[in-house]
Structures are given as structure tokens and as C-alpha cells.
Amino acid sequence: MNTIKHQNFSTIYHDLLTEAYYMPDYVSAPRGLTIRELTNVELHLLNPYSNSFKNAVRSPKPTYLYPELLWYFSGRNDLEFISHYSKFWNRIANDDGTVNSAYGNLLFTEKNEYGLTEYQWALESLKKDKDSRQAIMRFNKPKHSYLGNKDFVCTLNATFHIRKNREGIEYLHMTTTMRSQDVWFGIIYDIPFYTLLQQQMHKHLRKYYPDLLIGDFRHYVLSEHIYEKDFKAVEDMLGYDFEPGSVSMNYSTDLINEDGSPSRELTLALDAVLNKNEYVEFNDPLINKMIEFSIRD
């Protein structure tokens, strides 16, 4: 297994780009597109708050990052909203104008036959049993296994678990598993979302376990790859420093409720964006950035 471990994502991302580009396990061509690929990768982030990066050549675009986060945590799956911020989604959308990889819709809106969302199931599992091994959220579901699917969901699942360290301090750890991830485009937006999920779960659980601390974030990927069209840009990027960045929630405000539905603040933020009301402001800098970077002319 290829393992990269560090306190901050900026260093992890630098090392991942370096290994995938200069020391790939394979050079292959799925769908006729040449890639350099690492397989069976573990990324171990010790500080889930240090979940982004800055680089002189390329950094995550706030005009995409924050609208996508708003879309996810609102539980939506409509192409109409997200396509304003990236035309990529137009290529993989369903005929009815929905998107399979709308992670928030999969976790916070869709309910199972027992009336529970994926997030609600994970939270309730840990509320019932602090040592539970059942706090899992499924992204890729059986309904996605159909021929001709242009958007076969890349993330398989996420799992939370609470464990004590040797000093008896309890931590909430999170693990995600993916079948495939684009190192150039996908991961820089996926990691902030996953770690915000961990932060939100931590906030909800602290109502029941007040001394609970946030723990590690581990990310397992079967294929981390770089497409040939991005090779030159990766070379350029690796010539500059990677500085730590953070996309974190304010613990005084929830993004979602315990059942996965959007919080009051997030609902008001979405309304502000849809109505182009840029004068709405909250005490949460993250929600304010969602509004600022989502409102378009």
C-alpha cells in the first residue's frame, strides 16, 4: 500500500502529486485516456482542520469550492444549480437533470426503507453505542449499477468511530473509501467536504459526549491518477511551495441537523444565493463564504 501521512493536507497533496507523477505504479489508459496511477493509496491526515492548500500555480477555486459545499450540505442533486459553477457536471448528468454524485443528496436527503438518511444512521449508531463499528455512510449504492451510467459514484463509503488513546482521551476518527480519484481535480475539493463532515459529526456528538475530541482522517483510494492533459501543469505546480489552508466550520453553527436536513442558517444562505441577496450575513465565516462565492450576476 502507498501511504502518505502528515499533519496537513498541503504536504500530503504535494507528496501525492510527486509520487503519482514521477513514481506511478502503472501507466494505463482507461477509456483510451492515458493516466499515471497509484493504486491502493492511504492518505492519513492528522489534523482534519488543515484540509486545504495554497500554491502559486494552482489552488482550489473559491468560486467552485464554496458553491459545491453549499450544494452538498443543502442536500440537492440538481444540475441547474451546480452547472453554474462548473460545466463538468453537464457531461455526466442524467436525462432528468439530476446528478448521481451529488454527495449531499446521497447522505442527507435520500432515506432508506426505515426512514433514515445515511448521516442519521451513522450518528444514531454512535449515540446508541460509543464503540460502534456500524457508523457507516454509503455513497455508491446498488441503484448506480446500470449500463450506460455516465456518473458511477467514485466514493464508496465513509465510516466514523470513537476510540480512546493510551491516555484515555476519546477521539472521533473518520475513514473514507473511494474506487477512483482524479489527483489533479477531484481530491482538492473532496477532502474539504469529507473533513467538514467529520467536523459536523463531531459537533453533533459533543452534545452526548462533551469531552470528545476530533481525531484523524484516513482516506483510502483504489486508484489515484493524473490524466495526460494535466501532466505539464503538475510539473509547473511542483516547482512551487504548498502552503497549508483551512476550510472549517464555526462550532457555534450547524451546517445540517441531526437527521441530515439543512440547518436554518444553511437554508437561509441558500435562499440568499437563489435570490441574489448579497447583504445577508451570519456569524459563521464558512456560511458567509458560501454566499459570497455562490452569488452570480
Give residue ranges: language-model regions:
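Terminal, non-catalytic protein-protein interaction segments that mediate quaternary/complex assembly
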Residues: 1-297
